[in-house]
């Protein structure tokens, strides 16, 4: 059987790139030749070379929010990017193009269509982004992490496959074993400000925890993001709250295994990791996220009683303190929430996406 050549398109943020990397590794494990299409400004420039995957760059940026000048320039920039993508697809003689959203996926998907190459797309969020909504009309197969992502979009049948996440998170001990082993300890609170940091979360948590009696306070492990480590540590000190504060947590599997409750944003990858790990959560969606997709992501967990969704615009330190006081005191409820989250997981997401790619490529 001919060795498959597959171009993976993903870029901009970790939410696009990490799931794509998981599928790329699965495809390579099956013997496929994989190359990557991205842009010069995205996180893929660091992550993809580390994975020893050839990285091809095209010149394209987002159009939304760029103003009139950006809209006028867009057709010329997109046309240029499409021709760059055509050249890359021809050079590697791709059998299939696989898109995960982000700026590079649009021109790459159009190039695939113009060259008659099969296109498969995957949407990570609970509401499809602009690029994937457009590409869904020309793709051979449309995959989504969550049901309803392409609601009100004229598209083919959507297959719900989940989000690929790192295997180490699926290899944690069972939920009941983890939660029961800590039954006599103070609860463990993991706070994730995200790799870039969520200022609202970083500022709110120290103030909320300060309102709890010392005997009620959990053990705290707080990831602040690179720019907010010192300022957040200073806030905890000012509020006289003990916390382990780190700009970045390298081993997220260990962090999830440690946690009884996670407070975090509701990015697609984070929500999928909470499901995979089986851990209770209180989600504070980013209010400025495009199409308010984080609120929709949070709703996936909240609607199944597998997490709590909060609203940043109205959330106060007193509100959060009350939630923590009630939630952390009820370990059986935390464990049940964690188990419900894990029931929503898709442990074989990367393999499922790879299966679809192989099936479509072989026609």
From Swiss-Prot:
GO cellular component term of the entry, any: plasma membrane
GO molecular function, one term: undecaprenyldiphospho-muramoylpentapeptide beta-N-acetylglucosaminyltransferase activity
Entry membrane topology: Peripheral membrane protein
Protein name as catalogued: UDP-N-acetylglucosamine--N-acetylmuramyl-(pentapeptide) pyrophosphoryl-undecaprenol N-acetylglucosamine transferase
Enzyme class: transferase
The organism of origin for this protein: Cellvibrio japonicus (strain Ueda107)
Family matches, as PANTHER family: GLYCOSYLTRANSFERASE, UDP-N-ACETYLGLUCOSAMINE--N-ACETYLMURAMYL-(PENTAPEPTIDE) PYROPHOSPHORYL-UNDECAPRENOL N-ACETYLGLUCOSAMINE TRANSFERASE 1
UniProtKB keywords: Cell cycle, Cell division, Cell inner membrane, Cell membrane, Cell shape, Cell wall biogenesis/degradation, Glycosyltransferase, Membrane, Peptidoglycan synthesis, Transferase
Residues that bind UDP-N-acetyl-alpha-D-glucosamine: 13-15, 125, 166, 195, 249, 268-273, 294
């Amino acid at each position: 059987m001919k060795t498959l050549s597959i171009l993976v398109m993903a870029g901009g943020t970790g939410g696009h790139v990490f799931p794509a990397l998981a599928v790329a590794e699965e495809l390579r494990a099956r013997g496929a030749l994989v190359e990557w299409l991205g842009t010069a400004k995205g996180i893929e420039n660091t992550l993809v070379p580390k994975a020893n995957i050839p990285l091809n760059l095209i010149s394209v940026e987002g159009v939304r929010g760029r103003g009139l000048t950006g809209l006028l320039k867009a057709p010329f920039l997109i046309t240029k990017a499409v021709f760059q993508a055509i050249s890359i697809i021809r050079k590697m003689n791709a059998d299939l193009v696989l898109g995960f959203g982000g700026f590079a996926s649009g021109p790459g998907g159009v190039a695939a269509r113009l060259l008659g190459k099969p296109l498969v797309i995957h949407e990570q969020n609970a509401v499809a982004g602009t690029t994937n909504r457009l590409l869904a009309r020309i793709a051979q197969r449309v995959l989504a992490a969550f049901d309803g992502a392409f609601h009100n979009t004229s598209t083919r049948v959507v297959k719900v496959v989940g989000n690929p996440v790192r295997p180490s998170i699926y290899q944690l001990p069972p939920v009941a074993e983890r939660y029961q082993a800590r039954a006599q300890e103070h609860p463990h609170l993991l706070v994730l400000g995200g790799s870039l940091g969520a200022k609202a979360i970083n500022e709110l948590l120290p103030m909320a925890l300060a309102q709890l009696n010392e005997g009620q306070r959990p053990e705290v492990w707080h990831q602040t993001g690179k720019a907010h480590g010192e300022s957040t540590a200073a806030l905890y000190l000012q509020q006289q709250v003990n916390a382990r504060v780190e700009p970045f947590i390298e081993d997220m599997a260990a962090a999830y295994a440690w946690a009884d409750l996670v407070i975090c944003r509701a990015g697609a990858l984070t929500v999928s990791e909470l499901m995979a790990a089986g851990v209770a959560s209180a989600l504070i969606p980013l209010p400025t996220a495009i199409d308010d997709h984080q609120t929709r992501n949070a709703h996936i967990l909240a609607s199944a009683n597998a997490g709590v969704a909060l609203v940043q615009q109205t959330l106060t330190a007193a509100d959060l303190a009350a939630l923590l006081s009630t939630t952390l005191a009820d370990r059986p409820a935390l464990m049940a929430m964690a188990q419900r989250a894990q029931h929503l997981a898709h442990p074989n997401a990367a393999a499922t996406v790879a299966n679809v790619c192989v099936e479509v490529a072989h026609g």
